[in-house]
């Protein structure tokens, strides 16, 4: 086993068995228990189409329910960098489009956005792009 953590307010334990292999052990209190999981992907945090309010509602509900959060990836678009041929000033949220430190701003803002939910995250995948 590589690592193991037990978030203080969750009914599960996440163990990292290998770099890309995790197990989640859920501690059921009875035979008729319910466990919640928020499965998400493609949040594209820096996209103007990313609904931060909806994401916050879902993440808040996950915390309230003690849910495991699994993010399959593509947390960022990151297509508005100086050297990216796909970049377009219309495809970037205004708070990230105003300065030369776009990548740092996106990563720091996303880290701040997700930090309150970190104890419930099982993993965050890389995504497909």
Where are these regions (language model features)?
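Short glycine- and acidic-rich boundary segments immediately preceding or forming the N-terminal edge
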Residues: 1-27
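Core catalytic region of metal-dependent phosphoesterases/phosphodiesterases
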Residues: 5, 31-34, 40, 45-129
